[in-house]
Curated annotation (Swiss-Prot):
Species name: Wickerhamomyces canadensis (Yeast)
InterPro entries, per database record: ND/Mrp_TM
Name of this chain's protein: NADH-ubiquinone oxidoreductase chain 2
GO CC field: mitochondrial inner membrane
EC number, as in UniProt: 7.1.1.2
PANTHER family: NADH DEHYDROGENASE
Family recorded in the similarity comment: Belongs to the complex I subunit 2 family.
TM spans (from-to): 2-22, 43-63, 85-105, 133-153, 158-178, 189-209, 236-256, 274-294, 312-332, 340-360, 372-392, 423-443, 459-479, 530-550
The keyword Mitochondrion appears for this protein: yes
Length: 567
């Protein structure tokens, strides 16, 4: 019901935003047609809220009624092809919330600008950043949603590969969705080639598992692994290692990370906000599920005394060390916004993998709890910083009298928002949460991450985590310093009496643009507005990041209840 309501919501939103469809209607039917579709959208929103309310009550009762009776808390559907538990359901809910928030960013861009050139009216299409919220764009998003949901619930080797490719191909198309853009097509082809390498490695691991076990169901493979036959266990572990390495290549973990830096920096801002978060959450969550399925947690201590598991621990440790070192040091020399966010994402991949590694060596639900808390705060921080960047793009164009929305490339271009106290406050909160300053949400994520790694006796990795966090805070603070205190690049700012009205719903960002000698505006950019929901989303995430400690005990109880389902 929840998934159906989401599809209804985004499909009808795309239809309403399709200007060509509206123009086909007569003037008398346009108003009624719009109202009818807006009512359908409201129905979709009501279903989503009602589903969340039902899920809250059912999940808690399901936990208490089954965990106390030591029953199997997994739900198998479609002849054991897919498996549901409270963990992957939580991740799916989190992903759906993130996707809805990211889709709302698109509407902040200019649609079309009309410019009068002497005698003729010239239409300068859509801006470089604009992605029309049409049925094609929404179809790609829907296929991506289906792929990530199927991946998180897969209990079959074939369904794993199909789900990964369904998710990956939708992202390949998404990076090249901007028409008549050579850079967009180059990014799509580049992403496709790198993803193909990861798919080959994943397919080799799947074929190796099938060759050894003659079975495609994960439960049966794990049952064979539990027999503790040395040669078979070694080969099964190697097969899973190939799958995990292929998945890590697809999200840009070290040492194969360079492609992600180039892709994020050259892609559209909206696309970057999507491809830098959604595949990362789904793939890392599924790697955690692989570890949980591979090692029966009821006999965890016995299984990890075997030497067969050292290969997995060593390889993950190397990837974590490289990700932490490169992610923390690499951002120090960057002056581009997306490059810094890309290195920050690489650093956070190391954090996530450290939580997963601590789960291997620790029969404790603290690792699951740390993962849930950290991935939740990371999603909130990521969405908030990209919404702020989108608003800053329009704010920057207002000062520079740009005709079309240009991407913010360098950090100093954020200097134009420092006259707006609301945007600066949001930026300080987001950067503080990335650093991990208490009592912000990011502090609790890093706190439980550190506790989990120390309890697992990974003291060297815990020390490296602290050092990398300190080093990364340097470029986070540099990011903030350039924005707030660097006046060298802000000489051409115009005094605007309405600076602080940016976060007030329904207003025109660009009030006026100076006339050029040969060009004058025939339309004062009435479409260049920040909608109510954008400001509400940003405000809501900032309040969650800032005031989550008020009911922190209740949050911990909820994450604890989710965690115990896996043990």
């Amino acid at each position: 019901m929840l998934i159906l309501s989401l599809f209804i919501l985004i499909i009808y939103s795309s239809i309403i935003n399709n200007i060509d469809t509206i123009n086909l209607l007569s003037s008398s039917n346009k108003i009624g047609w719009k109202l009818q579709n807006y009512n359908i959208i409201r129905i979709g929103i009501i279903i989503i809220l009602y589903s969340l309310y039902i899920f809250k009550d059912i999940s808690l009762s399901y936990i208490f009624n089954n965990y106390n009776n030591n029953n199997d808390l997994n739900i198998y559907i479609f002849n054991d092809l897919y498996k549901l538990n409270i963990f992957n359901i939580y991740i799916i809910f989190l992903l759906l919330i993130v996707i809805i928030s990211l889709l709302s960013i698109n509407t902040t861009y200019l649609t079309k600008i009309q410019i009068k050139n002497n005698n003729n009216n010239i239409s300068i299409g859509k801006s470089d950043n604009y992605i029309e919220l049409n049925i094609y764009y929404i179809s790609i998003i829907i296929f991506n949603i289906i792929g990530l949901i199927l991946l998180l619930t897969s209990n079959n080797l074939i369904s794993i590969f199909i789900s990964i490719e369904l998710q990956s191909y939708s992202l390949y198309i998404l990076t090249g969705i901007i028409p008549k853009s050579q850079k967009s097509g180059h990014n799509s082809l580049f992403y496709y080639l790198i993803g193909g390498i990861g798919s080959i490695i994943i397919l080799y691991g799947i074929s190796l598992l099938y060759y050894i076990t003659s079975n495609i169901f994960i439960n049966n493979i794990n049952l064979i692994y539990s027999l503790d036959i040395y040669n078979i266990n070694n080969n099964i572990l190697i097969g899973w290692l190939f799958i995990i390495i292929g998945l890590l290549i697809k999200i840009g973990a070290a040492p194969m990370y360079n492609w992600s830096i180039l892709l994020y920096s050259n892609s559209n801002t909206i696309i970057t906000s999507y491809i830098s978060l959604i595949p990362k959450i789904s793939i890392l969550s599924y790697i955690l599920l692989i570890i949980l399925n591979l090692y029966n947690l009821n006999n965890l201590n016995n299984l990890f005394n075997n030497n067969n598991n050292n290969n997995l621990i060593y390889i993950l440790s190397i990837i974590i060390i490289l990700s932490l070192i490169i992610g923390s040091i690499g951002g120090l020399t960057q002056i581009k916004i997306k490059n810094i966010l890309a290195y920050s994402g690489l650093l956070n991949i190391g954090y996530f993998l450290l939580i997963i590694l601590s789960l291997i060596n620790n029969n404790n639900i603290n690792s699951i709890l740390a993962y849930i808390i950290y991935i939740t705060q990371y999603c909130f921080n990521h969405i908030s910083i990209f919404i702020l960047l989108i608003i800053a793009i329009i704010y920057n164009n207002n000062y520079n009298n740009f005709i079309t929305n240009k991407n913010l490339i360098y950090i100093y271009e954020l200097n134009y928002i420092k006259n707006n106290r609301y945007l600066i406050f949001c930026l300080i909160i987001i950067i503080g949460s990335f650093i991990g300053i208490p009592p912000l949400f990011g502090f609790y994520g890093k706190y439980y991450l550190l506790i989990s790694s120390i309890n697992s006796n990974y003291l060297f990795l815990s020390l490296l985590l602290i050092i990398s966090s300190i080093i990364s805070s340097i470029y986070y603070l540099y990011f903030l310093n350039i924005t707030l205190f660097d006046n060298n690049n802000n000489k051409n700012n115009n005094n605007n009496n309405n600076n602080e009205s940016l976060l007030i719903p329904s207003f025109n960002i660009i009030n006026d643009i100076k006339n050029n000698t040969s060009l004058s505006l025939s339309n004062k950019l009435k479409n260049n507005q920040v909608g109510n929901y954008i400001t509400y989303i940003l405000s809501s995430y900032i309040l969650i990041i800032l005031f989550n400690f008020i009911q922190w005990k209740n949050i911990l109880k909820g994450t604890y209840l989710i965690s115990i389902l896996l043990f």
